From Swiss-Prot:
<dbReference type="Pfam" id="PF02142">
    <property type="entry name" value="MGS"/>
</dbReference>
<dbReference type="GO" id="GO:0004643">
    <property type="term" value="F:phosphoribosylaminoimidazolecarboxamide formyltransferase activity"/>
</dbReference>
<dbReference type="InterPro" id="IPR002695">
    <property type="entry name" value="PurH-like"/>
</dbReference>
<dbReference type="InterPro" id="IPR011607">
    <property type="entry name" value="MGS-like_dom"/>
</dbReference>
<dbReference type="InterPro" id="IPR036914">
    <property type="entry name" value="MGS-like_dom_sf"/>
</dbReference>
<protein>
    <recommendedName>
        <fullName>Bifunctional purine biosynthesis protein PurH</fullName>
        <ecNumber>2.1.2.3</ecNumber>
        <ecNumber>3.5.4.10</ecNumber>
    </recommendedName>
</protein>
<dbReference type="Pfam" id="PF01808">
    <property type="entry name" value="AICARFT_IMPCHas"/>
</dbReference>
<dbReference type="GO" id="GO:0006189">
    <property type="term" value="P:'de novo' IMP biosynthetic process"/>
</dbReference>
<dbReference type="InterPro" id="IPR024051">
    <property type="entry name" value="AICAR_Tfase_dup_dom_sf"/>
</dbReference>
<dbReference type="GO" id="GO:0003937">
    <property type="term" value="F:IMP cyclohydrolase activity"/>
</dbReference>
<dbReference type="GO" id="GO:0005829">
    <property type="term" value="C:cytosol"/>
</dbReference>
<keyword id="KW-0511">Multifunctional enzyme</keyword>
<keyword id="KW-0808">Transferase</keyword>
<comment type="pathway">
    <text>Purine metabolism; IMP biosynthesis via de novo pathway; 5-formamido-1-(5-phospho-D-ribosyl)imidazole-4-carboxamide from 5-amino-1-(5-phospho-D-ribosyl)imidazole-4-carboxamide (10-formyl THF route): step 1/1.</text>
</comment>
<feature type="domain" description="MGS-like">
    <location>
        <begin position="1"/>
        <end position="145"/>
    </location>
</feature>
<keyword id="KW-0378">Hydrolase</keyword>
<keyword id="KW-0658">Purine biosynthesis</keyword>
Length: 526
């Protein structure tokens, strides 16, 4: 057998593969390669042997069969010191390094015009087989599936051809993760088309998702619970701003509750196309305001519920200004501030409060352009999966059901309060006026009690509910919610409608001279 160990290179993602191949030759490897990878390397004058020349067996079936040969898999799977005689008998040389990444199945199925045949032809067979073979035999073989690992592999090799067992093991685990994700995507795609016409269905027969641990957390919701933060692989690659892709610039490590609350704040502020500030406590908005002056937006949001805002999470949908950062730091204790970006000087302004976590998430999409993701909720023994609630309501969608017509200003406030109510835990009631929250009632078992709490919050903050609007995330089952609204001076109401007693609530609104509109869309949040 050859004294020089072999490295086999067969990649779909050809980023930096030429440089990596040159580095492997310098380290002492002989190279084998296939198809497009072989052509690219030879075009750059890299000394490489085509796999078909090595095996004596040609590529066939339009490339479907290239590496499925005993000389390849024997060279990868052979146990050094155990299988040497068999390998020698059959002229199988050892392959000590396998560099493979797979056909672009994810990119293929992401196309709007993808056909079943396109998908099938982009299911890699030889690639995963080599990856799994090399990963299984990691005691002797290195497996590289990610171009991001090329540099560390070359650095680890130095002037030799041997990787440490620790590195081979790490690369092997990464390889199995890679093939697991790949097979999961295939199962999801094909499993959502298990019907007579192979038409796509909303949810696949099995549900496969891969998450990557990005952080061990001190504890979970409570100190006696262990916790970690995992991120979806597609989220890591996505350009959509999220807590999963946000970058922390300052402060202590995020806690479990910080992450959950920051997610709630960021998702709420995304709902507004105009400059907005959202303050969240325990996953509920406690103050929201829209204003082109960011300092004013913050101060107004804070004034809705100063007590609850203490130790809260603050989110903006525009770059954080130096003035707003100073206003926050000078005014309150805050756990997290998140914005698309920050102005020069912000970190210097927040440095006096070194524990404050400052995060940037990148530009936010317009509300109507947000990618629809899936939401998961674990129940004992199972997982509930649904589309993310990105339902939008405009003025044109509103159905006026009362004698009194809402004014243009009231319609603007109704839509504002509706956007907030969507992110408040059910039963949710939001009072608003002048594009700012007046009071928020969250999480009550009775809708009318949420309304009462919103009024109490407003009174406690010294904010007048007279002439304000009210949003309800679901319909009013009885007229008591309307009667209560009249008692505190509510002038207009927005709700989904759809109750068997809608006639009673409409009659109540008419009795009190309140304008009321139906959206036809519910926003339960549990």
């Amino acid at each position: 057998m050859s004294k020089a160990p072999l490295a086999l290179l067969s990649v779909s993602n050809k980023s930096n593969i030429v440089e990596f191949a040159q580095g492997l030759i310098k380290a002492g490897f002989g190279l084998l390669s296939t198809g497009g990878t072989f052509r690219l390397l030879t075009e750059h004058n890299v000394a490489v042997t085509e796999v078909s020349d090595y095996t004596g067996f040609p590529e066939m079936m339009d490339g479907r069969v290239k590496t499925l040969h005993p000389k390849i898999h024997g060279g990868i799977l052979g146990r050094r010191g155990t299988d040497d005689a068999v390998m020698s008998e059959h002229a199988i040389e050892r392959i000590d390094l396998v560099v493979v990444n797979l056909y672009p199945f994810a990119e293929t199925i992401a196309r709007s015009d993808v056909t079943m045949n396109d998908a099938i032809e982009n299911i890699d067979i030889g690639g995963p087989t080599m990856v799994r073979s090399a990963a299984k035999n990691h005691a002797h073989v290195g497996i590289v599936t990610d171009p991001a690992d090329y540099t560390r592999v070359l650095e680890a090799l130095g002037d030799g051809t041997t990787l440490t067992h620790a590195l081979r093991y790490d690369l092997a685990v990464k390889a199995f993760e890679h093939t697991a994700q790949y097979d999961g995507m295939i199962a999801n795609f094909l499993g959502s088309r298990v019907n007579e016409n192979q038409e796509p269905e909303d949810f696949s027969r099995t549900f496969n998702v891969q998450l990557e641990k990005v952080q061990d957390l001190r504890y979970g919701e409570n100190p006696h619970q262990k916790a970690a933060f995992y991120v979806e692989n597609n989220a890591l690659k996505s350009k959509q701003a999220s807590i999963a892709t946000a970058k922390q610039l300052q402060g202590k490590a995020l806690s479990y509750n910080n992450i959950a609350d920051t997610d709630a704040a960021l998702e709420c502020v995304k709902a507004f196309s105009t400059p907005a500030c959202v303050i969240v406590k325990h996953a509920n908005p406690c103050g929201v305001a829209v204003d082109t002056d960011q300092v004013a937006a913050y101060r107004t949001a804070f004034s809705t519920d100063p007590e609850s805002s203490f130790g809260g999470i603050i989110a903006f949908n525009r770059p954080l200004t130096l003035a707003a950062a100073k206003a926050i730091i000078d005014n309150q204790f805050v756990e997290v501030i998140i914005a698309p970006s920050i102005e020069d000087g912000v970190l210097e302004a927040t440095a006096s409060k070194k524990n404050v976590r400052v995060l940037v998430c990148g530009d936010l999409p317009a509300p109507e352009l947000r990618d629809r993701q899936l939401d998961y909720k674990r129940v004992n023994g199972g997982l509930l999966v649904q589309e993310q609630d990105l339902g939008l309501i405009t003025a044109n969608d509103l159905k006026i059901v009362t004698d009194v017509q809402p004014t243009e200003a009231q319609i603007a406030d109704l839509l504002f309060s509706w956007n907030v109510a969507k992110y408040v835990k059910s039963n949710a009631i939001v009072y608003a006026k002048g594009q700012r929250t007046i009071g928020v009632g969250a999480g009550q078992m009775s809708r009318v009690n949420s309304a009462r709490i919103a009024a109490i919050k407003a009174e406690h903050a010294g904010l007048a509910t007279e002439g304000a609007v009210m949003a309800s995330d679901a319909f009013f089952p009885f007229r008591d919610g309307i009667d209560n609204a009249a008692e505190v001076g509510i002038a207009a109401i927005i709700q989904p409608g759809g109750s068997m007693r809608d006639d009673e609530t409409i009659a109540a609104a008419n009795e009190h001279g309140i304008a009321m509109v139906f959206t036809g869309m519910r926003h339960f949040r549990h």
